Amino acid sequence: MKFALCNEVLQHLSLEDGFAKIAEIGYQGVEIAPFTLKENPLEIDESDADRCIEAAKSAGIEIVGLHWLMAKTEGLHLTHPDEDMRNAACEYLKKLTNLTSQMGGKIMVLGSPQQRNLEPGTPYEVAFERA
């Protein structure tokens, strides 16, 4: 069994130093929170993925995937009545899926309860259809 740590807990360090610390304290892998890469997670791109790959290689740890996928984003929600908001969330998750794959990760932890909770008054069945 491998153990991984979300890099959010070390976001006060540079990405490279954080990954090195994760390895130093005995973890074999890292889950990356997108908001630790850019202030606006919607702006993450392939160069950010490349930086993560290099930092993980240097530290000798594996990128297991992404975590807190929709945290610190605005205008994204999985079950909101606004179709544009749902579509934007879908496109963002597709982008993160590609970046996870590029980094060699296999796990995506949604977390981010505000973007997946039901809007007040929305029946579960309606929210399920929207998602």
What do the predicted segments below correspond to?
Residues 19-22, 46-54, 93-97:
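Generic structural signal for well-ordered alpha-helices
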Residues 16-17, 57-58, 62, 75-131:
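Active-site acidic/histidine proton-transfer and metal-coordination neighborhood
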Residues 9-11, 34-36, 69-72, 114-116:
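Active-site-proximal loop/turn and secondary-structure-junction residues that shape catalytic pockets
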Residues 1-13:
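Boundary/entry segment of secreted carbohydrate-active catalytic domains
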Residues 33-57, 112-119:
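Glycine-rich, proline-tolerant flexible connector loops at the mouths of alpha/beta enzymes
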